[in-house]
Amino acid sequence: MSETRTLQFESPRALQSLYANDIKLLKNLEDSLGVKVTTREGWVKLEGDSNRVDKAQHVFEQLEKARQQGVDIQKHEFNYALKAVSEEGDENLGDVVSTKISTSSRKPPIVARSANQRAYVEAIQKHDVVFGIGPAGTGKTYLAVAMAVAALKKEQVARIILTRPAVEAGEALGFLPGDLEQKITPYLRPLYDALREMLEPEEMERALSRQTIEVAPLAYMRGRTLNNAFVILDEAQNTTTEQMFMLLTRIGLNSKCVVTGDVTQIDLPANKRSGVVEALQALKNVPGIATVYFTERDVVRHELVRAIIGAYQQHRSPAPASRK
C-alpha cells in the first residue's frame, strides 16, 4: 500500500544537519529504500510503499537521535544509519559513536564508527588478550593503537610495543642493507602512520626516543618478558605458529595484547600454517581472551573499498557444484 508521511523537525538547520546538508545523501536514501523524499524548511515528506516509508522514517529517527546526542553527522554516519536499517540491523548510530577514545588534548577523540568497532573497543577494555580479525580498512589496527595511546596517557601501562612480522623479508633482516632502523622502517610504516594521527610530532618523537613507544619486528620479541605494556601484533596472519606462541607467552604482569589480522590475506609459504589461525582455534575457550570479527560493513576507508572487498569475496567463494 502506497503512503505519504511527513516528519517535522525543530528547525531547517536541524533537518539539514541530519544529511550533512548534502542532497546527494537523500538521493542515496531514495535509491536504497525505493521511496521519494521531499524536504523543505523543517520537514521531510516520504512517499512510497508503507514498509519502505517505515524504513525511511527509521533512518531519520536514528539520525535525529544521534544528533541530539551531539553526533556530528557526516557522509559516513548517514550511510551507516541507512545501511543498518536497509539490512535490518539493530545497531543504534548514537550508541555506536558514543564510544570515544581520547589520545591527545589537542586532537579530537577517535570515535567508533560501527557496532563491531564498538564491541572491539569494549573487548580491549575488559580483556587482557584480544584478537581483531577482518578485512583491511575496518579499523582493527587503528583502534588498537588508539587504545594503547589512551592507556599510556592514563598511566595504565608504562610503554607501548607495536610489532608485526616482516614476512616480505622472511624476517632475515640481517641480509638487508642499512642499519636496523633503515631495515625495519618500511615494514612498520603503517604503525608509525597510526601514531602520527594520534600524537603531536614532538610527543611522538620523545616517546620513540625514550622507548616509551617501541616499534619493532616480531623477531625482536624473542626472549623478552613484556611487563606493564600494551602490546599490539599487527598483520598476525603472517606469523608462523611458532612466532604466535612465542609472542603470546611473552606477555608479562599488568599487560594487554591485541592481535590483528586478516585470515584471507596470508602471505606465508604454502607449507607454513598461519599462527593466528591456530590461535583462534586453540584459544577460543580460554577465559580472559576475546575475539571480535569484522566484515566489509565495518570498512571506514573510501566507500569503494567496501564494494571491492565484497566483490572479491564473492569472486573467490567456491561456485556451487552443478547437478548432473
Task: Pin down the residues of each PLM region.
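Short glycine-/aliphatic-rich beta-strand segments at the starts of folded cytosolic domains
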Residues: 1-16
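Flexible glycine-/small-residue-rich
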Residues: 9-11, 39-41, 48, 164, ...
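Short amphipathic alpha-helix segments
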Residues: 14-31
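Compact, well-ordered interaction domains used in eukaryotic information-processing assemblies
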Residues: 27, 33-36, 40-42
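Interdomain "pre-motor" coupling segment immediately N-terminal to P-loop NTPase/helicase cores
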Residues: 38-97
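Proteins enriched for Cys/Gly/acidic motifs involved in redox and nucleic-acid/cofactor modification
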Residues: 82-113, 125
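Conserved helicase motor core of SF1/SF2 NTP-dependent helicases
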Residues: 105-115, 123-233, 237-324
